[in-house]
Amino acid sequence: MIKLKDILNEVFDTNLLENNDDYRIFCDLDGVLVDFDKGVKQLTGGISFEDYVKTKGYDSLWSIINQNGSIWWSTLPWIADGHKLWSFIRNKDVTILTAGSTKNTGKLAIEGKKDWCLKNLSAIVPVIVTNNSHDKQQHAQPNHILIDDLPSNINEWKAKGGIGILHTTAEQTINELQQILRQ
């Protein structure tokens, strides 16, 4: 099977899309590239996800998110150091692996997240939107690296034989990726 990167490299006589074929990177969106929390604060008048859920309930927050439709998901801002991480991984064998959502936002989140990737990343970046975060582990293999900000996703990924990087900052994730890719 011919990969798009191979065709582009041949057409442009370049190795701009060079990657380490031994590894495939799966990168989460919310909390890694996208600032979900900032988006929630914009919807709730500055109240954080956690505080809003504590005071008004989980269902109330998801109701507000749903009222804003897929446009809310597609216009979420980049996380502060998201561009730095994306600049490092974009020319590697990378797939966006993100969860649709947990509270009745499935179709809206799927449409919005795919649109966000199209507008902010590239039309050629594969995007997989799972029904929930636990479904991410179905893509784990020994040479597959998951970058995710949720410890439970990393633990499930590793339990299925994949390599997991718990994302806290772009710098930390890049350092861990460099160590893995050097092996």
Language model features: what each stretch is:
Residues 73-78, 82-110, 117:
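Substrate-recognition element of Asp-dependent hydrolases with the DxDx(T/V) motif
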